[in-house]
Curated annotation (Swiss-Prot):
This is DNA replication and repair protein RecF. HAMAP family: RecF. Keywords: ATP-binding, Cytoplasm, DNA damage, DNA repair, DNA replication, DNA-binding, Nucleotide-binding, SOS response. One of its GO terms (biological process) is double-strand break repair. GO terms for cellular component: cytoplasm. The gene is recF. One of its GO terms (molecular function) is ATP hydrolysis activity. It is found in: Cytoplasm. The RecF protein is involved in DNA metabolism; it is required for DNA replication and normal SOS inducibility. RecF binds preferentially to single-stranded, linear DNA. It also seems to bind ATP.
Length: 384
């Protein structure tokens, strides 16, 4: 996972050429042919714009940009679950048919099929990297550490496809440890085995996060000093992450293992595990103002977040060879004319497909001729 000093070739565009939805949110059935360029969705609030890009976010691992329970995603009063199908096009692999959905009724998780063959959600990363900016992220820098940690891990996942499984396996092991401690178990051998797994996975998680932050920082350094979006300085606040690169990984692993073993009584009393990468926080600073992001104005925080995600999108394209698909929900309304123009220019420079939503079509007039425009009303799309 190393960034090059320059982009040797333009990353390949990954584009959704056809999107089909069945019983997804307010879409009973939708079949939408698309060109390779950007897509703009306009319409009133509640019409289904965000629902559509949420469906696209399910073409990546996880629970989508809303992190919703699958039963909540299926259309109300519809039998069964939901289905999403996308025809993708990319020069790296040619055409690909991606399907995902649920059976409904609480029957298992969502299933994934790629070119008709059952696959895992992590396999989706071989075909597309999907990044997003949504209004719920506006409080990222002022909210709880768990939201920033989740944001951090999604950034890592886009450039290190094994990261998601590490995190899931670590959390599963931690839940097992917590359950044993809460049940009053004194099975030291079983606890040792779980803590060994947590130490190995936790150290690997910390190393992947630290590496990703180093690569993102290097990418930010390569961007123009006076760009349209302020540069961010990012730091990891975590016992393991702060020691990555300073101490040997095996020493960190052993130290974390010892911390877990010595902390059993304390963790039993607390009802949870108090040390580990599940406590890490992402600290972001507004570089031009030398100010913590949490203390910046709402507008400055939004610009800082957009700049960080665009830098991450560049890095993702460079490392994967695929320009990411970007989902930008209500983003133009928060930017002045200069920054909107700059954003549209950067999207073209990235070379990927972007889906943008908004209530005011005029904010996207600069994209006329370069994007497909659709009006969304009650789950129905009309080309405009």
């Amino acid at each position: 996972m190393e960034a090059k000093d320059h982009i040797e070739r333009r990353p390949d565009r990954v584009s959704i050429r056809r999107l089909k939805l069945v019983n997804f949110r307010n879409y009973a059935e939708l079949s939408l042919p698309l060109g390779p360029g950007h897509v703009v969705l306009t319409g009133e609030n509640g019409s289904g714009k965000t629902n559509l890009i949420e469906a696209i976010s399910f073409l990546s691992p996880g629970r989508g940009l809303r992190r919703a329970a699958y039963d909540d995603v299926a259309r109300a009063n519809a039998e069964g679950g939901f289905a999403i199908h996308a025809a993708l096009d990319c020069m790296i692999y040619g055409d690909a048919e991606i399907g995902t959905g649920t059976a409904g009724g609480g029957e298992g998780g969502r299933k994934v099929r790629i070119n008709g063959i059952a696959a895992s959600a992590d396999d989706l990363l071989d075909y597309a990297r999907i990044l997003w900016v949504v209004p719920s992220m506006d409080g990222l820098f002022t909210g709880g550490a768990s939201d920033r940690r989740r944001f951090l891990d999604r950034m890592v996942l886009a450039i290190d496809t094994a990261h998601g499984k590490r995190v899931l396996d670590y959390e599963k092991a931690m839940r097992s440890r917590n359950r044993l401690l809460n049940d009053g178990s004194n099975d030291d051998q079983w606890l040792d085995a779980i803590e060994n797994q947590m130490a190995e996975l936790g150290t690997a998680i910390a190393a992947a996060r630290a590496q990703a932050m180093r690569l993102i920082a290097a990418m930010i350094e390569r961007l123009p000093a006076e760009g349209p979006f302020p540069k961010a300085d990012c730091f990891l606040e975590g016992a393991l992450e702060s020691r990555i690169g300073v101490e040997a990984a095996l020493d960190l692993e052993e130290d974390f293992r010892r911390t877990l073993r010595d902390g059993r009584a304390r963790d039993r009393a607390a009802g949870r595990t108090l040390d580990g990468p599940h406590r890490t926080d992402l600290i972001v600073q507004h570089r031009p103002k030398s100010m913590p992001a949490a203390l910046c104005s709402t507008g400055e925080q939004k610009a800082l977040l957009i700049g960080l995600i665009l830098a991450h999108a560049r890095l993702t394209a460079e490392l994967s060879g695929m320009a990411p698909i970007l989902l930008l929900d209500e983003i133009a309304a928060h930017l002045d004319m200069g920054r909107r123009a700059a954003l549209f220019g950067i999207l073209d420079e990235l070379g990927g497909q972007a889906f943008m939503t908004g209530t005011d079509r005029a904010l996207f007039d600069a994209l006329a001729g370069d994007a497909q425009f659709f009006n969304v009303s009650a789950g129905q799309l009309t080309g405009i």
